[in-house]
Amino acid sequence: MKIRASVRKICEKCRLIRRRGRIIVICSNPRHKQRQG
């Protein structure tokens, strides 16, 4: 999980989701997991 100021999709399988007021990215590739800090 990377914590970043700006999250974005890295590949076409990445999905942007809003959870508890935070933007997170989930993907089939675990390296692409991100959360807004």
From Swiss-Prot:
Stored NCBIfam families: rpmJ_bact (TIGR01022)
GO molecular function, one term: structural constituent of ribosome
Organism: Arabidopsis thaliana (Mouse-ear cress)
One Gene Ontology cellular component: ribonucleoprotein complex
Principal location class: plastid
UniProt xrefs under Pfam families: Ribosomal_L36
InterPro entries membership: Ribosomal_bL36, Ribosomal_bL36_sp
Family from the record: Belongs to the bacterial ribosomal protein bL36 family.
Superkingdom of the organism of origin: Eukaryota
BP terms from Gene Ontology: translation
UniProt keywords, alphabetically: Chloroplast, Plastid, Ribonucleoprotein, Ribosomal protein
UniProt-recorded name of the protein: Large ribosomal subunit protein bL36c
Subcellular location: Plastid, Chloroplast
